[in-house]
C-alpha cells in the first residue's frame, strides 16, 4: 500500500518555506515608504559619489584564472562527499574518482601548455 502520509512533514516544510519569503516580500512592499528623488536615482559607491566611467574592461587573463579556479572548485565540491564516504563505497568508486581527477589534470596541463596560466 502506498502511504503518502509519511511525506506530510516534507510537504508542510516545503509550503511553509515557500510562503515565508513571499510574505516577507509582500509585507515589505506594502509597509516600505515610497520616496523618489535624485538621491534614489544616483549610483552609490561606498558612501561617496562615483567618479569616472562605470564600464571598465577587464583583461582576458582574469577570466582565464577565474575559469581554472571554478573548475577546481567544482572538483573539490564533487570530491568532498566522496572522501567522506570512501570506506563505504568501495574500490570501483575510487577508480571513478581517480579517472575524474586525471581528466581534470589533463585539462590543467592543456591550459598550461596553451599559455592560459601565463600572466604576461
Curated annotation (Swiss-Prot):
Q: Is Cytoplasm a UniProt keyword of this protein?
A: no
Q: Which UniProt keywords apply?
A: Chloroplast, Membrane, NAD, NADP, Plastid, Plastoquinone, Quinone, Thylakoid, Translocase, Transmembrane, Transmembrane helix, Transport
Q: Which domain of life is it from?
A: Eukaryota
> Catalytic activity annotated for this protein?
a plastoquinone + NADH + (n+1) H(+)(in) = a plastoquinol + NAD(+) + n H(+)(out); a plastoquinone + NADPH + (n+1) H(+)(in) = a plastoquinol + NADP(+) + n H(+)(out)
Q: Which InterPro entries match?
A: NAD(P)H_OxRDtase_bac/plastid, NADH_UbQ/plastoQ_OxRdtase_su3, NDAH_ubi_oxred_su3_sf
Q: Where, per UniProt, does this protein localize?
A: Plastid, Chloroplast thylakoid membrane
UniProt cross-references to Gene3D superfamilies, sorted A to Z: NADH:ubiquinone/plastoquinone oxidoreductase, chain 3
Q: Does the keyword Acyltransferase apply?
A: no
A GO biological process held by the record? photosynthesis, light reaction
Signal peptide position in this chain? none
Per its record, how is this protein called by name? NAD(P)H-quinone oxidoreductase subunit 3, chloroplastic
From which organism does this entry originate?
A: Nandina domestica
Q: What is the lineage of its organism?
A: Eukaryota, Viridiplantae, Streptophyta, Embryophyta, Tracheophyta
